[in-house]
A protein has these predicted regions:
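Short, charged/polar N-terminal "headpieces" of proteins
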Residues: 2-56
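Serine/threonine-rich low-complexity intrinsically disordered regions
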Residues: 10, 20, 31, 60, ...
């Protein structure tokens, strides 16, 4: 999947800032074992004033950790970044490919997941596809 250079995008907001204004959010931190991508992908139900997206962390997710946000769109694209350039240039194409692979499920979770039961959230998480080794 071709990726344009990630320049001139705003800094990614810390996760703590995005969670502070939310009433109810379902979320999960997905490690490499679940995604096939080194680092952690944070997925959530609708939050903030932005459109559907995931956050990528180069390591464990954390409220003040650098990250990049990738839209759940066709095609996915980086819309905010606070990671070092070399990290985002390596990982953004992988995260974009993973988002494309799971787009329908991620959009359904973003739009409807806040009302799901624990069993429904578990089925969603278990149904996400892992990116094949490249």
């Amino acid at each position: 999947m071709p990726m344009t250079a990630v320049t001139n995008v705003p800094a990614d907001a810390p996760l703590a800032d995005e969670l502070a204004d939310e009433d109810l959010v379902e979320m999960a931190n997905l490690p490499e074992e679940d995604t096939g991508i080194p680092g952690t992908i944070f997925v959530s139900t609708r939050m903030g004033r932005h459109g559907p997206c995931v956050k990528y962390f180069d390591g464990r997710a954390g409220e003040a950790q650098p990250s990049c946000s990738v839209t759940i769109a066709d095609p996915p694209r980086v819309v905010a970044n606070s990671l070092p350039d070399h990290v985002v240039s390596q990982r953004a194409p992988l995260v974009s490919a993973w988002v494309a692979l799971n787009r329908d499920a991620l959009l359904q979770f973003w739009n409807e997941g806040a009302s799901w039961t624990r069993a429904e959230v578990s089925r969603f998480l278990d149904g996400l596809k892992r990116l094949k080794e490249r």
